[in-house]
Swiss-Prot record:
This is Small ribosomal subunit protein uS14. Part of the 30S ribosomal subunit. Contacts proteins S3 and S10. Keywords: Ribonucleoprotein, Ribosomal protein, RNA-binding, rRNA-binding. GO terms for biological process: translation. Signal peptide: none annotated. NCBIfam families: PRK08881.1. Pfam families: Ribosomal_S14 (PF00253).
Length: 101
């Protein structure tokens, strides 16, 4: 299981990303707007750089909902491969069966 601090850090990042999402989108649109003046675009670029580092969605990491494990994550289920296997074998995930061919 991942450390509680790592899980909490990731949750804090998610909140920060959500908080600044609209402002980031607005600044990025201004930067990409070719009709805006160079001064406006440069000013928007500086404001974007001044935002918190954790406000960028790139810094988010998918983690298992049960253990917090960062690797082997299945987006469809929100679980790591280990816990997904356990829950499927117990029959907790409907419609998923072991492969046999």
């Amino acid at each position: 299981m991942a450390k509680k601090g790592m899980i909490n850090r990731e949750l804090k990042r998610e909140k920060t990303v959500a908080k600044y999402a609209a402002k980031r989108a607005e600044l990025k649109a201004t930067i990409a707007n070719v009709n805006a003046s160079d001064e406006e675009r440069f000013e928007a670029m500086l404001k974007l750089q001044a935002l918190p580092r954790n406000a960028s969605p790139v810094r988010l990491r998918n983690r298992c909902g049960l253990t917090g494990r960062p690797h082997g994550y299945f987006r469809k289920f929100g679980l790591s491969r280990n816990k997904l296997r356990d829950t499927v074998m117990q029959g907790d995930v409907p419609g998923v069966v072991k492969a046999s061919w």
